[in-house]
């Protein structure tokens, strides 16, 4: 065990990227069902599509999984509303400041990780 496996309650310290256009429920549930942390890539999904993928994730796995949300997404209010309503437990944020949404997500017992870039190196920081 290490800090990643303990934090997310996963078997292996593997986190799939929340890649736009390809990180849907099938890929994310496959990663989660095999001991990693699968992430839905919300950046390319309209709110209704994201909601559908979240519901399919709930059906496809009982293992931990999360969503990667680019904070520059134009419909963030709707995305956050869906995340709260559908009881998502883990949210990775990127592409913007997490300050506006982190307190609300944490208040609802959601683990929040912000992914940011420094120059060419990508870093992950638990908020």
Predicted segments — roles?
Residues 1-126:
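Active-site entrance/lid segments in N-terminal catalytic domains of soluble metabolic enzymes
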């Amino acid at each position: 065990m290490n800090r990643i496996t303990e934090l997310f309650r996963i078997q292996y310290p593997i986190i799939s990227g929340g890649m736009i256009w390809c990180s849907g429920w099938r890929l994310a549930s496959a990663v989660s069902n095999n001991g990693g942390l699968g992430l839905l890539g919300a950046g390319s999904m309209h709110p209704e599509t994201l909601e559908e993928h979240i519901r399919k994730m709930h059906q496809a796995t009982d293992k931990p999984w999360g969503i990667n949300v680019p904070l520059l997404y134009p419909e963030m209010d709707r995305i956050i509303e869906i995340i709260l309503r559908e009881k998502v437990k883990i949210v990775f944020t990127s592409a913007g400041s997490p300050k506006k949404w982190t307190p609300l997500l944490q208040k609802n017992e959601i683990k929040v990780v912000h992914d940011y870039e420094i120059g060419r190196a990508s870093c992950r920081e638990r908020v």
